[in-house]
């Protein structure tokens, strides 16, 4: 659930113009209006402590930019430059540049884990349902017997994921510091963005190369599919709690009896 909450707050870069940096000005803004336009309070501070002026301006959204609610005005720190930015940040959680940078990467990795998780839930259950596989429910997979005990599996998983996550964290703190292959040092990556390592291991088909418009389109699709996957995993979890069966079994039951096998049946008295 935390990943779903995080996905709704990530969007773009902080509001900063070259002129404001050149004049040493600090731009303070009010919270974004949840729906419509708003007025922003802009305070400019000069390099001398005695010279101070304040002005009020109106910020208009780009009419061609897709927004989460048509006609709404996005907050200034969401300028549409990041993939999946539709101007949605009613709580202002992305207003701080450092928080935005961290939350952007947090959403990205949660999206990817959720897509893997959704595939691990739906595909084996569907193949088991039609008789191709014979796998346990995802909800009880941790109770099964494996080639070793679960404690050993957990420790091995913790070490491997900890190493990978440590390198990812280092790349966030200092971009480009992990672009050299730790096993084959002659293999180096250049021109990559944080969160998108590319190369043979992470982009074997070369989809991450091309025009900026194409790259942003693919990254936006990844974010949108990841957000949907986070909702799907959360939905499958709640579904199993209330029905005791998986999503594919629930789907087949609904198709067999659409008038009675619905979401409301879980809350109706037996």
UniProtKB/Swiss-Prot annotation:
Residues at which chlorophyll a 3 binds: 144, 222
Signal peptide boundaries: none
Modification(s) after translation: Photoregulated by reversible phosphorylation of its threonine residues.
Membrane topology, from the record: Multi-pass membrane protein
Binding site for chlorophyll b 1: 68
Keywords, comma-separated and alphabetical: Chlorophyll, Chloroplast, Chromophore, Magnesium, Membrane, Metal-binding, Phosphoprotein, Photosynthesis, Photosystem I, Photosystem II, Plastid, Thylakoid, Transit peptide, Transmembrane, Transmembrane helix
Residues bound to chlorophyll a 1: 88, 107, 227
Co-factor note (free text): Binds at least 14 chlorophylls (8 Chl-a and 6 Chl-b) and carotenoids such as lutein and neoxanthin.
Cross-referenced PANTHER family: CHLOROPHYLL A/B BINDING PROTEIN (PTHR21649)
Family of this protein: Belongs to the light-harvesting chlorophyll a/b-binding (LHC) protein family.
Biological function: The light-harvesting complex (LHC) functions as a light receptor, it captures and delivers excitation energy to photosystems with which it is closely associated.
Protein name, per record: Chlorophyll a-b binding protein 7, chloroplastic
């Amino acid at each position: 659930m935390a990943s779903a909450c995080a996905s709704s707050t990530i969007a773009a870069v902080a509001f900063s113009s070259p002129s404001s940096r050149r004049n040493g000005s600090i731009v303070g803004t009010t919270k974004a209006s949840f729906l419509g336009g708003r007025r922003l309070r802009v305070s400019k501070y000069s390099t001398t402590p005695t010279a101070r002026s304040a002005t009020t301006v109106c910020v208009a959204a780009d009419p061609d930019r897709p927004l989460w609610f048509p006609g709404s005005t996005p907050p200034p720190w969401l300028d549409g430059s990041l993939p999946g930015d539709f101007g949605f940040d009613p709580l202002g959680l992305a207003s701080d540049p450092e928080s935005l940078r961290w939350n952007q990467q947090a959403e990205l990795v949660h999206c990817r884990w959720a897509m893997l998780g959704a595939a691990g839930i739906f595909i084996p259950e569907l193949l088991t349902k039609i008789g191709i596989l014979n796998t346990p429910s995802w909800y009880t997979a941790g109770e099964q017997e494996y080639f070793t005990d679960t404690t050993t599996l957990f420790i091995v998983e913790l070490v491997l994921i900890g190493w990978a996550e440590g390198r990812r964290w280092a790349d966030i703190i200092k971009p480009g510091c992990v672009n050299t292959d730790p096993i084959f040092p002659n293999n180096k990556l250049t021109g990559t963005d944080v969160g998108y390592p590319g190369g043979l291991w992470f982009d074997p088909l070369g989809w991450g190369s091309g025009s900026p418009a194409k790259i942003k389109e693919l990254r936006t699709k990844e974010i949108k599919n990841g957000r949907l996957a986070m909702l799907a995993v959360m939905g499958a979890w709640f579904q199993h709690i209330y029905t005791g069966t998986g999503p594919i079994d629930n789907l087949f039951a609904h198709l067999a009896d659409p008038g009675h096998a619905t979401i409301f049946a879980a809350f109706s008295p037996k």
